[in-house]
Structures are given as structure tokens and as C-alpha cells.
A protein has these predicted regions:
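Surface-exposed, flexible loop/turn segments at secondary-structure boundaries
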Residues: 70, 194, 218, 248
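Short, surface-exposed beta-strand/loop "edge" segments at domain boundaries and coil↔beta transitions
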Residues: 72, 157, 248-250
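Structural motif
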Residues: 67-68, 161-162, 190, 215, ...
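C-terminal regulatory/interaction regions
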Residues: 163-185, 200-205, 220-279
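A sequence-composition feature that detects small, non-aromatic residues
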Residues: 35, 57, 85, 101, ...
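Flexible, acidic/histidine-containing loops and adjacent segments that form or flank the divalent-metal
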Residues: 1-155, 239, 243, 255-279
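Active-site-proximal loop/helix segments of hydrolase catalytic cores
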Residues: 75, 133-214, 220-222
Length: 279
């Protein structure tokens, strides 16, 4: 089990916090004896256990879109196969170690894809960077990511985690908000990866603001194909919010393009938190 944990660790050269100075979320929850999933009496949180919007605080509601129970079962099956493949077939009484191994193992078995086909170039129109967005993320780890709608003061915010936008996802979203809807904000799935979003979703579900949360170092997210599609195909004014001043954000921050396609770019500076006020 220690070997699995060590294999899942990202080296200090790749991240600022190493294994000696940080812990997985699951370990912190276990150590501090924080009760999990109280709104479902300890059961899994998925679209099967929270059918309707749930009031988590006064006038604040949450509607869970995914994962489905099928996604959770597939994740469990893959986890077991990975453990067997590493000759791990014995019982571990140390719950903290097992929790840590589970999280690190999921990091290791995530699918990896080829880099985007378009390279940043100063010439031409933004539309030339739009991709077909037809390839789909097949990672069950990402499919099992929690996605939900947060609602407050008649405003809805769509948080997509690392979710995969597929037919099941669109069907569930349609049941909650209808065939089309304009959100106050959408957190892009999987840091803006082109494998996790579709043109159909972009056309049907728009927002005042789109959030792209990544430093772009590990997988070079977001994909320019995704950003170009969001900007060019949604004609309403929108803001693309980046928490880091990444190259693709700087590339899109062109006055000519912003005027033509009715958008603005907001970038963080790594030191200060970006705050959004919708009151």
C-alpha cells in the first residue's frame, strides 16, 4: 500500500507542495473525523440519491447532475482491477493509508490524450481555432466527477468539475433547467479540455461568465479549440475568467477580437484571489 501511495505522488519539481508537506483531501477528512454526505444520510452523492434541488442553506440550493450510480460502480470496478494488477489482495486496517492510496491511484489511472492540434499564432481570425470537439474523454475517473447547479437569489451557477458532457449528462441537465438555459456562470469541465465539452452544449447552455481554473503546466489546459468555440459561437457578451495569467489567456486578450466577438478576459496573478460578485 505504501508503494501505491508513493507512485501516486507528484514530485516536488512538478508541484509546490510535496508529500511531506501536504495530505490528500480524504486523509484530512478522515483525520478530523468530518461527517461525509450528511444530506444523504451517509449514502453516495449522485443523481440517484438527490433527485431534486436541495436547500443547503437559507435560499441556497444545489441540484446534482452527476455522477450516476453506474459511473460510481464502474469506478469501483476499475479501482479493484488496478489493485489486483499490482498484487494488492490483502485487507488493510489502516483507513487513512487506504484513503490516501485510493486518491493517488485515481490520479495515476486518468486517461491521457494527444496535445491539441492548433498552435498559438498571431495571425488570422479567432474562428480558425475552433475544433470539432467530437472526441470524448473515456476516463471513468472524470465521468465520476461531481457536477452540480448552485442556485442563489434566482441565479444559477453550473459547476462541471472534470465531468464529461455526453448524452446522459445533457439529458439530466435538460430535466433540471430545460433544453436551453443561460447561467450566471459556468465552471468549464476539466480545465477547458476539448474532450469534455461539445458544440451542442455550448449552443444550448450559455453564461455571463466562464471559469477556467488551471495553471496550464501539467496538461497544457485549456484547449484553444474549446475557448474559440465558446467565444465565437456565443454571441452574447461574456467574460472568460482565468485564475492564472496563462499564455492562452494572454493570446485571447486582443482588443480587435474582444470587440468583434463580444467578450472580455479576466486574469488572476497567482498571488491574489479573484472574487466575483453576483449580488
Amino acid at each position: 500500500i505504501d508503494k501505491i501511495i508513493s507512485q501516486g505522488v507528484i514530485s516536488d519539481s512538478q508541484q509546490k507542495i510535496g508529500i511531506n508537506s501536504g495530505m490528500s483531501l480524504g486523509v484530512l477528512i478522515t483525520k478530523n473525523k468530518i461527517a461525509l454526505n450528511t444530506i444523504t444520510s451517509g449514502k453516495l452523492i449522485c443523481d440517484n440519491t438527490l433527485y431534486d434541488r436541495y436547500e443547503i442553506a437559507k435560499n441556497i440550493y444545489i441540484s446534482v447532475i452527476g455522477p450516476s450510480i453506474d459511473d460510481i460502480v464502474l469506478l469501483e470496478d476499475q479501482w479493484k482491477k488496478e489493485m489486483v494488477s499490482q498484487n494488492f489482495m490483502f485487507r488493510v486496517n489502516n483507513k487513512i493509508k487506504m484513503t490516501e492510496a485510493f486518491e493517488y491511484q485515481l490520479m495515476r489511472i486518468k486517461s491521457h490524450y494527444s496535445p491539441e492540434s492548433y498552435k498559438i499564432c498571431g495571425d488570422g481570425d479567432l474562428k480558425k481555432y475552433i475544433g470539432d470537439l467530437s472526441e470524448t474523454d473515456g476516463s471513468i475517473v472524470n465521468k465520476s466527477s461531481i457536477s452540480f447547479i448552485l442556485e442563489y437569489n434566482e441565479k444559477k451557477f453550473l459547476f462541471l468539475g472534470d465531468s464529461v458532457i455526453d448524452e446522459r449528462f445533457l439529458s439530466k441537465l435538460k430535466k433540471i433547467v430545460g433544453n436551453q438555459y443561460h447561467f450566471s456562470a459556468i465552471k468549464l469541465p476539466h480545465h477547458g479540455s476539448r474532450f469534455n465539452i461539445t458544440h451542442e452544449f455550448i449552443h444550448r447552455y450559455t453564461a455571463d461568465e466562464y471559469y477556467c481554473s488551471t495553471n496550464s503546466k501539467k496538461y497544457n489546459h485549456p484547449d484553444l479549440e474549446t475557448l474559440a468555440a465558446l467565444i465565437c459561437e456565443n454571441t452574447k457578451f461574456k467574460k472568460i475568467i482565468f485564475n492564472y495569467p496563462i499564455k492562452k489567456a494572454l493570446f485571447l486578450d486582443k482588443t480587435q477580437w474582444k470587440n468583434k466577438y463580444n467578450y472580455d478576459i479576466v486574469m488572476g496573478d497567482e498571488k491574489n484571489t479573484i472574487e466575483r460578485n453576483f449580488l
